[in-house]
Regions:
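A structural boundary/capping signal
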Residues: 1-283
Length: 283
């Protein structure tokens, strides 16, 4: 007897990618986000497109080039020769978070550009990491001469003074001034790959929530629950979206699960009431 195994769903595929932190495939996991919008997308083709960029870049850099020269070659190649840059005209277009679209249009937001930039930088042997800077994702490279922080939206390298200036609105809004001020270095800690993918998904989550696009928001929430299985806020948010879509049994399960875990949650009373309303509608 012969039988054909069905390929895994895009969600199951994503879940398999993000299961293990030790060998987390950042580029592949980030690229797979786009399968919600492009269900027939060939992720291996996306990875192949990045490999082609990597090969073109390698031809421009000698094997014995020092790290600083490699970094300069990457900046020239990525921003000037290939034309990658920030989408200043349509910053909130969901395609800015879909790597297949970013590769095609050469336009994205800081974090999607950073994922591509990091892949190319690491392919050159650079010690490059993502940085979850408040409000604007950054990348940094450790060189023998010191640390370089780059804005992936523009390709600009930022001085300490630039970074402090960019931080001021966040610090003032959070009351982190004077005696409560947080050292700059704490904002420049490496961002793990799992957190990078979570930030990409949360960008899409906010776009779809603002548009009240519940089906797309549910697709993003499904990924976040699998990516962050112990972040109970994501379970709650999926439950609320399910309720909006009329899937009350699944919503009941998620909201009850959230309340079972979030004893001290500030929204406990509101979610309890929402759960009561759902149960009344069910019974």
């Amino acid at each position: 007897m012969f039988f054909q195994l069905a390929p895994p769903s895009s969600l199951a595929y994503f879940e398999s990618l993000v299961r293990d932190d030790e060998h987390f495939p950042l580029l592949e996991a980030a690229a797979s986000i786009a399968q919600d919008e492009y269900p027939d997308l060939d992720i291996q083709q996306v990875l192949g497109d990045v490999d082609q960029l990597q090969a073109r870049l390698h031809r421009r850099v000698s094997n014995d080039a020092p790290p600083l020269q490699r970094l300069r070659a990457l900046a020239q190649f990525f921003y000037r020769d290939m034309g990658f840059g920030g989408n200043v005209n349509n910053f909130y277009d969901p395609d800015n978070s879909h790597l297949n679209a970013v590769l095609k249009t050469r336009r994205g937001i800081p974090i999607s550009l950073a994922v591509l930039w990091l892949e190319l930088a690491q392919g050159l042997g650079l010690k490059a990491m993502g940085v979850g800077f408040p409000g604007h994702f950054m990348v940094k490279v450790s060189l023998p001469q010191g640390q370089v922080v780059v804005d992936p939206f523009t390709g600009e390298s930022l001085s300490r003074e630039d970074l402090i200036e960019r931080l001021q609105p966040h610090q003032q809004a959070m009351g982190l001034v004077g005696d409560n001020e947080v050292p700059l270095g704490l904002y420049l800690q490496p961002c793990p790959p799992r957190d990078i993918v979570a930030r990409m998904l949360r960008n899409l989550k906010e776009i779809h929530r603002t548009a009240e696009d519940w089906p797309r928001l549910l697709a993003v929430s499904e990924r976040l629950v699998r990516l962050l299985p112990t972040v109970w806020d994501e379970l709650r948010d999926r439950g609320l979206v399910l309720a909006e879509l009329g899937h009350l049994q699944q919503a009941e399960r998620d909201l009850a699960g959230y309340l079972a875990q979030a004893d001290d949650a500030p929204d406990r009373a509101a979610i309890t009431q929402r759960l009561r309303d759902i149960r009344r509608a069910l019974h």
